Each structure stands twice: as structure tokens, then as C-alpha cells.
Swiss-Prot record:
Residues 77-87 have a biased composition (Basic and acidic residues). Keywords: Aminotransferase, Cytoplasm, Glutamine amidotransferase, Repeat, Transferase. This is Glutamine--fructose-6-phosphate aminotransferase [isomerizing]. Its EC number is 2.6.1.16. The gene is glmS. CDD domains: GFAT, SIS_GlmS_GlmD_1, SIS_GlmS_GlmD_2. Homodimer. It comes from Streptococcus pneumoniae serotype 4 (strain ATCC BAA-334 / TIGR4).
Length: 602
């Protein structure tokens, strides 16, 4: 949610800011703006809508220092007045901010009586506060910023510019992601390494409650009391080809197509030269020491946890419970005596999950993060990390990260099970089975045209739809329904097929689309009974089945894969269903309304 870019040094700041904001579009936003300094001249430009609209307003705007921002409204409507950057009372100071300031109304009442505000955002309160301390109390910019930071409560990433000193950007963070990008003759600030990958692949982390003074030729990290902190840089494993669409019309389609490659990358990452599964021994021991695994996640990652639950339990001999991070952050249930928390997050920045992780660390509960982003907050703050190796996922609707999460957890389950002498784990040839999954996905992807025709007939004009399944297929139905509703805006729900008769079947009427998933030979006939029930009430049914349970009347037939991995192959046609349904409704596949890729506020 939201994005920050900033640059100071020997550069064309306007171009870098616009290009950086374009790279952050995937995070979600409703307005954007930049502030550019060139000596005594400065330019503040804002726009509601896409970055292209902002870019069109920046002709002639030049400078070597600047900050930019994409805003996803939390306080105040999406208007130019509420768009960032924001200025102080005298307009000397300019600030961009990601996060939520919890005590902004208290600050306004206690410190800012008589100040005039152009918008309704908490960010404007913050920059006015900094300006007050610098201009009314005579503090230096650095001391004014520090004093404000000691007062402000909440989650934030700040980038501050003093229009009287174009040689420096001041930044600070707490519970919201922010990085320093290191260039030659210039340095940068960004919410995400992808924003600056065209300029550098060298980055420096900022930890919570740290303040950084960024100049063209230096970066100084301090805590809020002024104590200097040493910080090494790291190299981001990204290149421009990772973040471009290539010949694809949408990132989502590109990322769907990348899933076979992701499966093979995971095999390479978690096997040795002899083809044996290799997972960090410390992670294996952490699972062995636990008497219960608690998976904490949100959205698609939560569904990936459900899809992995049976596999983890059967191969590790450890009970697994699922928790929604946003619920656990405000009250944990009664835990077992030796819990292990596994956090699943594509971005590694999910604020709700981090809230739980902070509490887990305070309680001394060991934790593992499964994420796509090395160096992310959840990765840094958990005891252990497993990476997805899926490459950047730009589309808001997650596809390849979901399948990679299940595959990564399969490697974990296999490694722990083998270490425990679990017979099922020893017999589970994961490398071979995951190779079959990759081939199955490729086969499904070769049938795009057929799937598109069926989807158009079924969903082009509908307002409601249902997915049904049993066992693992029910968990896939949950993810499939989320994918369809979040980008096509079709009201869709995923149900356990056996629950239809307990209430949901009342919603079935003539023409209601019902998509049924069938992969389990033990359960398939029961689901087919439910299909007959909804068909008898007028539903239009589309069936997706694996070959081992398929019938001639099924619409989409998939290669049979190992039951533990069937959610990976079964979900792919449902991703295409969502993609084509959205495409034929004339909607933006990659950027659905009201959604952000990385949810960094609670």
C-alpha cells in the first residue's frame, strides 16, 4: 500500500521519481505526487489517478533532489489536496509518508492550534509538527525531526526535504518498509527495491525507529537519540527483465505462465547435487521441537496454508492450525506448550502478520517466515526464513506466489519427515512429483483458448458465482473464489461442497454459475452428487477435474499429480478463469479497484 521514492545527487530527479513510481504501481494507489528541488527553485506536482497523468504534468520540472509518493487513501478522500507530498505551514518543509499516525488528532489539538491545513491527512499533521519545531522553536531540521518522531505514534515511513537545503533527504521508519538505494554520485530512498532497480542493485536496510540522513555522497544511520549505527549494504537479486511485462498484455498472465519455471527453480533451490532435499537444519530442528505448528497469514497466503495443512501434518507428525493474522494480532488463542509460528507472506511486509510476529518474539515463540522477498521485515524479524524464489510478482492478484508457497512448504514437510523417519515422507519423491506438477501446469496453459471460450460463456454477464470442492479441493475453491472476485468484481464464494445443502443452495437459481473442482478419487463422486443438486435447480456448471477422476462431460481435465501437490495444479485453471472473466469485462487485470499488493497498514 502506497510507495515512496526519493533521490539526491547528480541525477535527473524528475525522471527517476516518475520511473520509480511506475515501478511501485503494483502496490496499489489512487493518487500520486512529486516534489523536486533545483537550488532555490522547487516544484510540487500532484495528480489523482494513474502515474501517466502525473507524468503529463511534469514537463519542464527539473532538479537533482526530489521525493515522490503513490497514495492509497487511509485518511481523507483521494484528492490532490490529500495527495502527497505535503508541505508545512510556511511551505519550507515537504514530507511523504506511508503508514498510519495513530495520534494525529491529539497532535493537531496539542501542538498545531492556528495552523492551516489543505487536506484531511495524518501526514500533513506530521509535516506541520516538524515545521513548528524548526521554525517556531528554532531547532535544527534534524532535531525538529527527532522531536516529532518521539511524539508520533503508529506505523510510518517518512521522507523529508527542507526546501532551504536541497542537498539532503531525511528519512525515518517504524513498522513500514523503507530502503536506501546506493548509487554513484547519488543516493536514493524507496519502499521497494524494484522502484530503483534501473539505477542500482545496492541497498541498505533501515530498521524500526531509525533515522537516516541521505546525501549524494553519504548515508548516516542513527537511532532517535542520535546514536550512530553501522549498516552494511546488500545486493538485490533483481534485474530489469524480472519486472517487465515483455510481450504480455498483463503481468498476471505473465506470472501465471511463469509457474512451471518457478516449480523448477524451487527444485534447484532446495535440492543438492545428488537430488536430495536440503532445508536449513536449524529450521528442521525448530519443527521437530514444536508440538504444534501455527500458520499465520492473510488472503491468498492464508489459503496456501490451508492447502498445505494435510501435507505438513502427515509428513511431520505435527498438528497444524491456521490463523488469520489480523485476528491474532489482537488476541491469540490458547497455545500449545511448544508452538512454532510459520508466517506466510509474499511481500514479507504484511502489517497484520508483523503485529503477531512482534508478540511472538516477545513471548519467545520460535518463528519461520515463508516469503518471496529476502531482507523483508518478516524475514529479518523471524528466527528463520524460507524463500519462494518466484521472482517479483507485480499483479495485485497473487498467482505464482501461491503455488510457490505450497511447494516451499512441501520441501519443509519432506525434509522434516525424512529427518523423523516418517515412512510417508521417505516414500514421497518430491522432486519427481513436483516435476510432474510443472508439466501439468504447462499442459493446462496450452489450453488457454479453450478455457477462455468456456469462461466467456459462463461468466461474462453474471454478478454471482460459486466454487465448490471437498477436501483439498475445498481449499482451492477458497483461493479460486478470491481470485475471481478481487479482479472481476463478480461476487464469488468458495464452499465445501457438502455444506451446500446446509444453506447456500438457497442462493442457486436459473443460470447461477457453479464451478466444481474434483481431484480426490475418494471424494469426487460425492462432489458430483452436489453438482447434480445445483444443476437440478438451474445452475450452469463448469467442472475442473484431474484425469484420475475425470468423465467425458468434464470441461477442463488436468494431468493427475500427487495428492499433496494437487492444489498447485488445480488452482492454475481457476487463475485463468479469473483472468479471462476480467479481460472480457473490460477491466484492468493487474490493478483492481481498492486493492493494494502489499498491505503495510493494519
Amino acid at each position: 500500500m502506497c510507495g515512496i521514492v526519493g533521490v539526491v545527487g547528480n541525477t535527473n530527479a524528475t525522471d527517476i521519481l516518475i520511473q520509480g513510481l511506475e515501478k511501485l504501481e503494483y502496490r496499489g494507489y489512487d493518487s500520486a505526487g512529486i516534489f523536486v528541488l533545483d537550488g532555490a527553485d522547487n516544484h510540487l506536482v500532484k495528480a489523482v489517478g494513474r502515474i501517466a497523468e502525473l507524468s503529463a504534468k511534469t514537463a519542464g520540472v527539473e532538479g537533482t533532489t526530489g521525493i515522490g509518493h503513490t497514495r492509497w487513501a487511509t485518511h481523507g478522500k483521494p484528492t490532490e489536496d490529500n495527495a502527497h507530498p505535503h508541505r508545512s505551514e510556511t511551505e519550507r518543509f515537504v514530507l511523504v509518508h506511508n503508514g498510519v499516525i495513530e495520534n494525529y488528532l491529539e497532535i493537531k489539538e496539542e501542538y498545531l492550534a492556528g495552523h492551516h491545513f489543505k487536506g484531511q491527512t495524518d501526514t500533513e499533521i506530521a509535516v506541520h509538527l516538524i515545521g513548528k519545531f524548526a521554525e517556531e522553536e528554532g531547532l535544527s531540521v534534524l532535531e525538529a525531526f527527532k522531536k516529532a518522531l518521539h511524539i508520533i505514534r503508529g506505523s510510518y515511513a517518512f521522507a523529508l526535504v527542507d526546501s532551504q537545503d536541497p542537498e539532503v533527504i531525511y528519512v525515518a521508519k517504524n513498522k513500514s518498509p523503507l530502503l536506501i538505494g546506493l548509487g554513484e554520485g547519488y543516493n536514493m530512498v524507496c519502499s521497494d527495491a524494484m522502484a530503483m532497480i534501473r539505477e542500482t542493485n545496492q541497498y541498505m536496510e533501515i530498521h524500526d525507529q531509525e533515522l537516516v540522513i541521505v546525501k549524494a555522497d553519504s548515508v548516516e544511520v542513527q537511532d532517535y537519540d542520535g546514536n550512530r549505527r553501522e549498516r552494511a549494504s546488500y545486493t538485490a537479486e533483481l534485474d530489469l527483465s524480472d519486472i517487465g511485462k515483455g510481450t504480455y498484455p498483463y503481468y498476471m498472465l505473465k506470472e501465471i505462465d511463469e509457474q512451471p519455471t518457478v516449480m523448477r527453480k524451487l527444485i534447484q533451490a532446495y535440492t543438492d547435487e545428488a537430488g536430495q532435499v536440503v532445508v536449513d537444519p536449524d529450521i528442521i530442528k525448530a519443527v521437530q521441537d514444536a508440538d504444534r505448528i501455527y500458520i499465520l497469514a492473510a488472503g491468498t497466503s492464508y489459503h496456501a496454508g490451508f492447502a498445505s495443512k494435510k501435507m505438513l501434518e502427515e509428513l511431520t507428525d505435527t498438528p497444524v492450525e491456521l490463523g488469520i493474522s489480523s485476528e491474532w494480532g489482537y488476541g491469540m488463542p490458547l497455545l500449545s506448550k511448544k508452538p512454532l509460528f510459520i508466517f506466510i507472506s509474499q511481500s514479507g511486509e504484511t502489517a497484520d502478520s508483523r503485529q503477531v510476529l512482534v508478540k511472538a518474539n516477545e513471548m519467545g515463540i520460535p518463528s519461520l517466515t515463508v516469503t518471496n522477498v529476502p531482507g523483508s521485515t518478516l524475514s529479518r524479524e523471524a528466527n528463520y526464513t524460507m524463500l519462494l524464489h518466484a521472482g517479483p510478482e507485480i499483479a495485485v492478484a497473487s498467482t505464482k506466489a501461491y503455488t510457490a508457497q505450497i511447494a516451499a512448504l512441501a520441501f519443509l514437510a519432506k525434509a522434516v519427515g525424512e529427518a523423523n523417519g516418517n515412512a510417508k515422507a521417505q516414500a514421497f519423491d518430491l522432486v519427481h512429483e513436483l516435476s510432474i506438477v510443472a508439466q501439468s501446469i504447462e499442459s493446462t496453459l496450452s489450453e488457454k483458448e479453450t478455457i477462455e471460450v468456456k469462461v466467456r460463456e459462463l461468466l461474462e454477464t453474471t454478478r454471482n458465482a460459486f466454487y465448490i470442492g471437498r477436501g483439498q479441493d475445498y481449499y482451492v475453491a477458497m483461493e479460486a473464489s478470491l481470485k475471481l472476485k478481487e479482479i472481476s468484481y463478480i461476487q464469488c464464494e468458495g464452499f465445501a461442497a457438502g455444506e451446500l445443502k446446509h444453506g447456500t443452495i438457497a442462493l442457486i437459481e436459473e443460470g447461477t454459475p457453479v464451478l466444481a473442482l474434483l481431484s480426490d478419487p475418494v471424494l469426487a463422486n460425492h462432489t458430483r452428487g452436489n453438482i447434480q443438486e445445483v444443476a437440478a435447480r438451474g445452475a450452469k456448471v463448469l467442472t475442473i477435474a484431474e484425469e484420475n477422476v475425470a468423465k467425458d462431460t468434464d470441461d477442463i481435465v488436468l494431468t493427475t499429480v500427487h495428492p499433496y501437490l494437487s492444489p498447485i495444479s488445480m488452482v492454475v485453471p481457476t487463475q485463468l478463469v479469473a483472468y479471462f472473466a476480467t479481460l472480457h469485462r473490460g477491466l484492468d487485470v493487474d490493478k483492481p479497484r481498492n486493492l493494494a499488493k502489499s498491505v503495510t497498514v493494519e
